Amino acid sequence: MWSLGVIVYILLGGYPPFIEQNQRELFRKIRKGQYEFHEEYWGQVSDDGKNLITKLLTVDPSTRFSADTALSNKWISADDSKLAAQDLGVNLEQFKKFNAKRKFKAAVSTVVAANKLASLGMDFKKNLDES
């Protein structure tokens, strides 16, 4: 569900939620869930859409939206006519400016590495507990 939050953020904002040149700082931002809705790109996005992203990008998995909860969110279940009225052209232009392939690949690599590190940490702790 967290990954879905990242994808929705990119689709609605035109750029990823976690951007940093320094990989260590990028990992820190991801682990702490530090991202922003910059008014320049998010001014046209509804509060319901931002709320959905916030609930999906919650760091603690026990309080993060489940798939069922996300599907019942107001933004997901909104009338098609409301969505049709939204102009996403601004997002498309921002997305074109963004070097998506390179940055997204780096973000995915970061998530994969963070998951591997978390898994190694759990394995290490488990081995210590068993000793």
Give the predicted meaning of each segment:
Residues I19:
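Conserved active-site beta-strand element of glycosyltransferases/polysaccharide synthases
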Residues D68-S131:
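C-terminal regulatory tails of eukaryotic serine/threonine kinases
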Residues K32-W42:
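Short proline-rich PxxP-based motifs
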